[in-house]
Amino acid sequence: MLTQPINLPKWLEENSHLLKPPINNYCVYNEGFTVMIVGGPNARTDYHINQTPEWFYQHRGAMLLKIVDPTDNNTFKDIIIRQGDMFLLPPNTPHNPVRFADTVGIVLEQERPEGSIDRMRWYCQSCKEIVHEASFHCTDLGTQIKAAVEAFKEDEEKRTCKKCGEVAAWKPAEGSLKDPNLEEA
């Protein structure tokens, strides 16, 4: 069945209460593609890895996309996506979307091909080693990512780095993230 257009400002006015932590997303379409409206703030330390690209459009405010760049020796990098910007993230790029208060974006993801595996990965803040990784075939972004984040949060053993022994945080430390909305472009 053909759907009707969504007026984004009106949808936000009527439905912003649906954007709840820890992911703060709401799937508005989920047939062939998943189209999510995502609000801020969110506070997570995981990096999501999926085998298909992700398209980001920032409707209101700026967001920070933390990545581990597989094309540059797995270097940790920050990409700022400002209001009005769009960005296509290549497949298999570990990424942590950080959204700040009063920001809204749209994320578009392909339906996962049969047999594809999504991963949620946490890195040690001290030595950058992988602390924990959860994997699953993603059929429902809204629930599966949240479940992986909650399981990591509740299990200190999963959060303990095998290399240096540091216990990884499940949310960023207060003041550790620089809000690009408070800077000049």
Curated annotation (Swiss-Prot):
It catalyses: 3-hydroxyanthranilate + O2 = (2Z,4Z)-2-amino-3-carboxymuconate 6-semialdehyde. GO terms for molecular function: 3-hydroxyanthranilate 3,4-dioxygenase activity; ferrous iron binding. It is found in: Cytoplasm. It is an enzyme of class 1 (oxidoreductase). Substrate binds at residues 54, 99, 109. The keyword Cytoplasm applies. InterPro entries: 3hydroanth_dOase, RmlC-like_jellyroll, RmlC_Cupin_sf. Its cofactor is Fe(2+). Its EC number is 1.13.11.6. O2 binds at residue 44. GO terms for cellular component: cytoplasm. A divalent metal cation binds at residues 124, 127, 161, 164. Pathway: Cofactor biosynthesis; NAD(+) biosynthesis; quinolinate from L-kynurenine: step 3/3. One of its GO terms (biological process) is L-tryptophan catabolic process. It holds the Pfam family 3-HAO. Gene3D superfamilies: Jelly Rolls (2.60.120.10). It comes from the Eukaryota. Keywords: Cytoplasm, Dioxygenase, Iron, Metal-binding, Oxidoreductase, Pyridine nucleotide biosynthesis. NCBIfam families: anthran_nbaC. Catalyzes the oxidative ring opening of 3-hydroxyanthranilate to 2-amino-3-carboxymuconate semialdehyde, which spontaneously cyclizes to quinolinate. PANTHER family: 3-HYDROXYANTHRANILATE 3,4-DIOXYGENASE. Belongs to the 3-HAO family. This is 3-hydroxyanthranilate 3,4-dioxygenase. The gene is BNA1.
